[in-house]
Structure formats: C-alpha cells, structure tokens
C-alpha cells in the first residue's frame, strides 16, 4: 500500500468530548452473534467499537455500530457495520493483546477534508469519568493528511479511525465513494510514526 504523509497538530482544548462514542483497547465490547459469525483468526484482533449515534455529525451512518479489527501479522484491517444493538456482549475477547507494547494509548481527534470541526474517535479508558475510574483523557491530537503528499488525481481518502500508541499511530482510511455506499470492505490501514 502506498504510504501517505501526515502532520500532527497538538490540540489543547478538550471541551465537547464525547467520551462514550468509542471503546478502544482494554475493555472492548463485541456482540456475541457478530463474534460467532466473523470466525476471527488468532491473529485478528478486535480493537475498537464506535456507536455511530453518539458521534456528533458523523460522515458515516448516523445509527448503528462500527467494529474495527486488525490482523496483527498481515496488518490487514476489517471493519464491520451493523445496525443491530449489541445487547449480548463479550467483554474479554483477544485478552492477550497488550496495548502496552505500543506505549501509552493516546486520545486522538480527527478532521475531515473541507470541514472545520473535529471528532473524537479514540479513548484510552472507556470508563473515564465514572466512579472508581483512574483513566485520564490525555492530550488530544489533530491528525491531518498532507495533501501535497498525494499523487495528482488520487482521491483524498477519509480517515474514520485514528488510534495513537506513544510514538506511532494506526490510521484507518476509506475512499469517500465507498463510504457513501456504506461499503466497508475497501478499508485501508497505515501505520504512521509521530
């Protein structure tokens, strides 16, 4: 896959965070029926869930759930979209996956092309703010594509999942046309060094 260059911008303002929109590493939640239907491989890890209804002005469906998976050997991503509410859940799948390998998880914000607003997609502690929680949101980071790094004529992909681990970031990319068709089979993954 062609590598895309990014630039990172620190964002100090942490207002208007929607901390319930996503669960990222540490306490993933996955619907039992979905888990059984996917036949996940031993190397394919569930890393995040997004509740579309809890994200302000999402560029993807306004309801339903997005589940992010990544094969840690081939680095091939899989994103599954369903409108079914995960009433029955599995809390501890992929327990051996240790985020500490990548350093401290970092909360990230992202910006979509042509829009001024940013949306929060990652949270290092899904229980942050709840009684007994020891988690902190950390510094937010705005991740932007450097348009100059894209070949002429290539459509700029949208990012709809950015996850930070200390000195690097995992970024999920999707072409705008695929997103409009709700076709999540054409998702790309890149690893970006800070």
Each PLM stretch: what is its role?
Residues 1-194:
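Preference for intrinsically disordered or flexible, low-complexity segments
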């Amino acid at each position: 896959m062609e590598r895309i260059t990014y630039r990172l911008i620190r964002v100090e303002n942490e207002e208007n965070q929607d901390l319930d929109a996503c669960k990222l590493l540490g306490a993933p939640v996955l619907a039992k029926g979905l888990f059984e239907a996917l036949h996940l491989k031993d190397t394919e890890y569930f890393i995040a869930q997004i509740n579309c209804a809890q994200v302000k002005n999402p560029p993807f469906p306004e309801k339903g759930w997005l589940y992010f998976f990544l094969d840690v050997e081939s680095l091939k991503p899989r994103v599954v979209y369903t409108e079914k509410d995960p009433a029955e859940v599995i809390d501890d799948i992929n327990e051996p996956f240790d985020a500490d390998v990548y350093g401290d998880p970092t909360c990230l914000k992202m910006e979509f092309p042509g829009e001024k607003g940013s949306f929060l997609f990652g949270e290092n502690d899904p229980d942050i703010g709840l009684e007994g929680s020891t988690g902190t949101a950390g510094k937010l980071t705005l991740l932007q594509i450097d348009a100059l790094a894209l070949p002429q004529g290539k459509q700029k992909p949208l990012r709809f999942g950015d996850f930070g681990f200390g000195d690097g970031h995992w970024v999920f990319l999707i072409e705008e046309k695929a997103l409009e068709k709700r076709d999540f089979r054409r998702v790309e993954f890149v690893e970006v060094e800070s």
